[in-house]
A protein has these predicted regions:
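Transmembrane alpha-helices of multi-pass small-molecule transport proteins
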Residues: 44, 59-63, 84-132, 211-215, ...
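C-terminal-most transmembrane helix of multi-pass membrane proteins
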Residues: 44-46, 313-386
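Hydrophobic/aromatic residues within transmembrane alpha-helices
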Residues: 81, 90, 140, 146, ...
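Transmembrane alpha-helical segments that form core, pore/gating elements
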Residues: 197-260, 264, 268, 357-386
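Loop-to-transmembrane-helix transition segments
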Residues: 59-65, 112-136, 200-206, 257-287
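Specific alpha-helical transmembrane segments that line the substrate/conduction pathway
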Residues: 89-92, 96, 141-168, 301-318
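Helix-helix packing/entry segments at the starts of transmembrane helices
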Residues: 150-155, 222-238, 286-320
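Loop-to-transmembrane alpha-helix entry segments
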Residues: 153, 169-189, 195-202, 321-341
């Protein structure tokens, strides 16, 4: 009991000292949420940081809910644009726009040499995973409902937990094993394999989830050797460049039919009229990532993390309103199981972390998020500035 009280007093004291650094650190922390933008996984690296007072929890919940809402609108815009434009120019221009914001931030927040990296192999590998995975993710949009695509993609946090156990030898108890099995059953139900209505295109967001989870393993190696901002910038810029040869190769190897018009290597439909929409896409993503970072900065992760799963029902509602999409029963049932599984695993992660090292925070799995978790010294600026 005395140890618990001491930790609580230490966390409050540390939080007060760090309060004046919150806004300066916000751009760095915002890059942790890039852009998976969930769509995706919340259960990866856990790191020590002071926990905010409980009185600020409502603000944190409001921030994370608004951030997830913006992510949903971002994906809905992408789905709408893919009806008229090929995917490759959209991904490239969006990456360029995000880079125009991120690179100046890197130069502003630190010395210019910090943008240089010796970890080219890791960055290129992560960029390949992102370019490949999220190209497949968005390629599924014209064929599936927004709810179905996002539900299957939310297998990413489950896969990340499995990969961490297999490749990083992290311990996992019976509670989380049971929750993982429950969640994967939900993914299978959402995909509905073996049924007459099964669509092979539903495998695309699952492959993206696997790519994303694999990139999380690399993120843990990068996260202790480079800042989150530099690592996130490399991932986004390189992935934006990789989609060009990736799209060209896809069109050379495969015969793209009429149904795959959005996958064709064509720039004819791309005009400057679409540029404001791409700027809006980039702005939505940046604001959403900032809001998620702010939420984890001012509130207890245990209070706000489960609200990231609000993305799934919001995507279902917006898909119905914007595209007249009525999700199938298996999508809704699988979605509910994934949400229950993910929230329970997050709860167990937090409980275990608090028992061993005290208050924690964790990485977000919003769609498109590069998943780079900052070091403890990056989150706590006193180690650099004092």
């Amino acid at each position: 009991m005395e140890v618990s009280k001491l930790r609580y007093l230490q966390s409050i004291t540390s939080f007060g000292r760090n309060l004046k650094f919150e806004y300066k650190q916000l751009p760095r922390l915002a890059l942790n949420r890039f852009g998976a933008g969930n769509q995706g996984a919340k259960l990866s690296t856990v790191i020590t940081t002071p926990v905010a007072p409980a009185s600020r929890t409502p603000q944190g919940i409001a921030a994370i809910m608004l951030g997830m809402t913006l992510f949903v609108f971002q994906d809905a815009m992408m789905k709408s644009l893919l009806g008229d434009f090929p995917i490759w120019p959209l991904l490239l221009v969006r990456a360029v726009i995000c880079s125009l914001v991120m690179v100046p931030l890197i130069l502003y927040l630190g010395p210019p040499h910090r943008i240089l990296t010796p970890l080219w192999a890791l960055h290129v590998t992560r960029a390949l995973l992102f370019a490949f995975g999220f190209s497949l993710y968005y390629a599924a949009f014209p064929f599936m409902t927004l709810a179905a695509v996002t539900t299957i993609f939310f297998a990413a946090p489950l896969l990340t937990a499995v990969f961490a156990t297999v490749f990083l030898k992290e311990h996992i108890g019976i509670h989380r094993i049971s929750a993982l099995v429950f969640g994967f059953i939900g993914v299978i139900i959402a995909m509905k394999p073996g049924a007459d209505s099964f669509q092979w295109v539903s495998v695309l967001p699952l492959i993206c989830a696997c790519s994303y989870a694999t990139s999380q393993m690399l993120a843990r190696r990068i996260g202790h050797r480079e800042t989150a901002m530099v690592a996130g910038a490399y991932t986004i810029i390189l992935a934006g460049l990789i989609v060009l040869p990736l799209g060209w190769l896809l069109n050379v190897v495969f015969d793209i039919g009429e149904q795959g018009a959005h996958l064709r290597w064509s720039w004819e439909a791309f005009t400057f009229d679409i540029l404001p929409w791409l700027v809006l896409l980039g702005a939505l993503g940046m604001v959403a990532w900032t809001l998620l970072s702010r939420a984890y900065q001012i509130a207890d992760v245990g209070a706000v993390a489960p609200f990231e799963y609000a993305y799934l029902p919001m995507a279902t509602v917006l898909g119905y309103i914007a595209f007249d999409e009525v999700p199938a029963w298996n999508t809704l049932f699988g979605m509910a199981m994934i949400i229950v599984s993910g929230v329970y695993i997050a709860f167990r992660e937090i409980v275990n972390a608090r028992q061993s090292i005290g208050p924690t925070t964790e990485a977000s799995f919003a769609p498109g998020n590069p998943g780079i978790v900052p070091d403890a010294h990056e989150i706590n600026p006193r180690e650099k500035l004092d």
